[in-house]
Amino acid sequence: MIHDIINIELDYEKMGIEHKGAAATMTTYIKDMYPDYQKPFERPLVIICPGGGYGHHSPREGEAVAVKMLDMGYNAIVLRYSLMPNEFPCQLYEAAYAINYARQHAREWDINPDKVIIAGFSAGGHVAASLGTMWNQEELRCFTKDILGVEPEAVRPDGMLLGYPVITSGEYAHRGSFENLIKEHYSELIDKVSLENRVTADTPQAFIWHTVTDGSVPVENSMLLASAMKK
């Protein structure tokens, strides 16, 4: 298995971001390949964003999920995106970087570049759904063109897998996640990061699951996103 930790090396200063703390990373879980006697599988890839309210990365939503995905025939990456005090759109840029990086290494990793899925749980679901809804929007246009040097389609997920995701900044918000994500620019950005309002015809398909008894992230988060995607 290719099991590496890859630092996400972005010129945050060039993007007007003062990055603080640990670097964002991608941890790979890529099945071994035997090209001498085995044709490429071109496996689908799942990029997993653990939850944690933008304050930490939940260990149960990282490696454990990646190992399960391996068992199901996927390759996997765990994206440990930047945490507080780093604010939006830092995490959005890192998710876009991860998608593009994976596609650039598709042959090396034996993955299908047209089957790159982003998954997320709780606040990690907000990271995943942010990329799914904003991949061709104003927040990413300059980043994809000037920093990555690619077209927007290079960072578009082919699907989203969202478990009890943080979505809305309205009545049913998981308020702590948004306070960590946009603390210094709360009033300026709070509406922009309410993702039920960012869905367009270009948003990729999603599998969304939640429980009505969730005492942390209200189930209405998933319902609002599903309703917006149905329209």
Task: Tell me what each language-model feature is.
Residues D32, D146-V150, K183-P204:
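Active-site nucleophile elbow and catalytic-triad environment of alpha/beta-hydrolase enzymes
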Residues H57-P59, A64, L79-P113:
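Catalytic nucleophile-loop/oxyanion-hole region of alpha/beta-hydrolase
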Residues G215-L224:
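Conserved alpha/beta-hydrolase "acid-adjacent" motif
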Residues M1-E42, P89, E171-R175, T200:
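N-terminal cap/lid segment of alpha/beta-hydrolase-fold proteins
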Residues N100-S177, I190-D191:
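Primarily recognizes the serine-hydrolase "nucleophile elbow" in alpha/beta-hydrolase
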Residues D202, F207-H210, D214:
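Short beta-strand/loop motif that positions the catalytic acidic residue
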Residues E42-G51:
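Short beta-strand element of the alpha/beta-hydrolase
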Residues P40, S58-I77:
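Short amphipathic alpha-helix adjacent to the substrate-entry channel of hydrolases
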